[in-house]
UniProtKB/Swiss-Prot annotation:
This is tRNA uridine 5-carboxymethylaminomethyl modification enzyme MnmG. FAD binds at G10, A11, G12, H13, A14, G15, V122, S177, Q368. The keyword NAD applies. NAD(+) binds at residues 271-285. It comes from the Bacteria. The gene is mnmG. It comes from Malacoplasma penetrans (strain HF-2). NAD-binding protein involved in the addition of a carboxymethylaminomethyl (cmnm) group at the wobble position (U34) of certain tRNAs, forming tRNA-cmnm(5)s(2)U34.
Amino acid sequence: MKKYDCLVIGAGHAGLEAAFILAKKKYKVALFVLDKKLVGNMPCNPSIGGPAKGIVTREIDALGGMQAIAADNTQLQMKLLNSSKGAGTWALRAQIDKLEYSKWFLNRIEENEYIDLIDKEVNSIKFVNQKVCGVYTVDNQFFESNYLIVTTGTFLDSSIHIGHKVIKKGPDDFNGSYLLAKQIKELDFQTIRLKTGTPPRILKNSIDYSKLQIEPGTNKKYSFSHFDRKFLDFNKQEVCYLAFTNNKIHEIINNNLDKSAMYSGFITGTGPRYCPSIEDKVVRFNDKERHQLFVEPESKHLDTIYLGGLSSSLPEDVQEQIVKNIVGFENAVIKKYAYAIEYDAINPIQLYPTLETKKIKGLFFAGQINGTSGYEEAACQGLMAGINVLCQLENREPLVLKRNEAYIGVLIEDLINKEITDPYRLLTSRAEYRLELRNDNADQRLLKYGYELGLISQSHWDEYNKNLENFNNTLKELETSTLKNVKEFKYNSRKTNTTLYEILKRPDYSFIDMEPFLKNKNTLDEYWKDKVDIYIKYGGYIKSQQKIINDTKNIDNIKLSSISDYKDVPNISLEARDKLNKVKPLTLGQASRVSGINLVDLINIKLYLENKKKQT
């Protein structure tokens, strides 16, 4: 028998964050994995980041987590998304070398004396008086601890579906977790059956890239990590490509829907609304002449590409027809066929905001087992579960992030308060405070918590505070520098008392234009210069946003009887339209309690009603 401070089941994105954050405080962790090849595995898209998700990765970094550093060290391409839009929507996305990513984490585990990686299946959890005592592995070894974090991902009672074939396996043909799934049900935890999928992998050298649209990275130095920054030169970055479906492909799919596991009743689990299979896209969006497909490298060491956007549960022969009808893929060779995977998840309303279960003390669930989708959503849950175990070990107050502090706070509050019916994906539209939850300010929002918990080093904290002081001094100087006393700055205005701060609010000016006229000009690096621009330009919008949010109070008195079809309401999500048209709530308060409806939807419904009232 071995005793540990905490046990973690699963070494995917959630499990790794949980283990490393505890090890950072020198707590001994046993990290269980079915196979060492599954450490940091990316069974689907080989990327980190994206809208909202890339900001989560930076939030993880600000709290002392690992994902940002791992992604920076194993990137194949880095891209700033939505750069033509406002900074509130900016997010980083890195194409990752999936083999190097796993290897990077394995090396970090080997170097860490506080993490024991144990490649054994856990088949049962031991409890006494509704408290965790430890776990048994399949060879009947017992590992003792008062804390257990379960991060089994999509492995819990998993089944692979290709056409009408059903295989009791986990992702990437690894074994699933069936004994543990059985015990969780026997403990009367409410479970839900979910489904996700992955597209085919194609041999790189069988594609005619001249027929595809090039998608390069961003030619500027960006990193997920705030301190351990590592950049990949633009000329060394891998190129991605865009391809498209066409009417012939749509015809093939429609003619073979009876062979799809999803459409022939073989799958009962609900699939992800925001990452539908190609069958779903063709059926649900039958007015579309084509759908985008993303041609992305998986690793420098692999001969395959990932064909994003073509996830499917159709049989192999139909997949062959589909792929060969994509322009540029006429001679393509499929090395690994697409499949759907069905698995058990926990209904997360059974959790506290700390991710500890209400039923059993010391038992935490984190990651896709809580009904989420995506590596970033999983990683942040693992981090928060690990931090809250740490808080209990040190008799601290739990760390529960608010919705206006982090996307992590939005995610966890949504999970524990709203019924999950399909895999939950973070979206910018879910965050009512999204102008405050930006890519550029994760450190300003969260670094203090990481430092207080001892998860951020003193040197990094000192570096941050020095930069913050320079940032604040720059803002003060911009506020006090007027056209009258900065005559060298050419600006067409008769008001000589106009400050550079006021001018910088305009979209056609940036901090670079002001910098030559400031005494503080040499103390900020590029990252903090961008912060100055964004802070000033978004100040007014953030105040307006807060006013609108405050106006949604007392929403139970706002009646919705005048709305016959929510398709008429602009700027609400498709999910909101679908669900509100089904439920037909009587008041805005009732609408707020419908799963999948967020504050942004409520604000836009209220604005619609106000505008409608003005017109009558």
